[in-house]
Amino acid sequence: MEEYKYVGKRLPRYDGMQHVLAKTRYINDIRLPGMLYVKAWRSPVPSARILKVDVSKAESLPGVVKVITWKDVPYNRYGFVADYPVLAEDEVRYIGQEVVAVAAEDLDTAMEAVSLIDVELEEREPLLDPLKGMEPDSIQVSPEGNFVYFGDKPVRQIRKGDTDAAFAQADYIIENYFRTAAQEHCPIETQCGIAQTDVMGRTHVYSMSQAIWFNKMWLAPILKKPQSMVHIMGGVVGGGFGSKNDPHTDLICSVLSLYTENRPVKWLWTREEEFTSSTHRGSMHMFFKDGVMKDGRIIARQVRSIRDGGGYILTNDYVGAKHAYGVAGPYNIPNVKVDTYVILTNKRPVSSMRGFGLYQASFADEVQIEKIAKTIGMDSWKIRFINAVRDGDTSSTQAELHSCALIEVMQAAAQRAGIKLDDDLLTMSSKVRLEV
């Protein structure tokens, strides 16, 4: 057997020794001369018009260096479709949305300054249910409506084959509803960022970001500077899982640094802020309908999914599209119809988290397999083997598949788990499809 250098070997983590010796340097460990500290006034309600913002008392507090509102942000929009304000302007869309930011000599002063800010809100009825958000007379979260668009359509559609004809042919029609809950990433290290603008006007950012180039792409227009004048230095990420793809602290710190006469500003979120204001995995509703033959073949699948998109778009369209691609699972289903919607609500924004929509699809898909097995009286392992993709099959998007290995992986998993498979399953291969 060929000896490999890495494959099959237990290798030490390159950063393991630094971690166990407590020598790893995180963004919060950075101390710079003249450091200022940031806190923000956040919305206490999920939906409201902003009638008045008075920061005069906060500005006059000794130790406060700068207080900013949206009027101080050179360009107050970011995101892939630039719908998200750095600081809220005339409305708030979720509890915890930043309206005013303060930079002060110390954290206590920054917190006191926030308590002196007077914001008058006209509270509105919030939209909290994405299913209700699809109704014609629903509360509108955005002036453009509640539907997140995929190109020029408010739905991501996938069509393969003729599902209506296949359902008419099927021996069983099996329908189920699945719902996955919202989920917080809970990184051990909460959001943290440091920014400093030097005498040449170049803004330097110490970032824990998982997506530094996204930050750079968004920061340059926000600051109205070329990208060459935005310098982002990545650090060790103390747990991210997708939450640190979004620039929770970097944008506001960078804007504040424009006004602090070259002094660095730092913002470390509390655990409460992490829970209430960071992006998270949104909940999803999934309606599955499968057409199944007595021999276990799934010949048709129809899925309607609705994702709770939170207050702004961010990566919602991408996550919705990936979810749509994934609802057929690793199975060869000849007829597929998928409609995936993302609906804005008055909740904190949702964004990337491990799997980008595929986790929800896989959960529903595999539970559906178990329910099919129970309905038709067949072992669920056998159903998975019968329907597993083979080389030459096509995906739900009609891409031809190669290098398939699901059958071999299931055979190995069963062996390791001590599960005895029938002989006909052990002779199956991902390279050739045998008659059932």
Per-range role (PLM):
Residues 1-436:
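Structural alpha/beta core scaffold segments of enzyme domains
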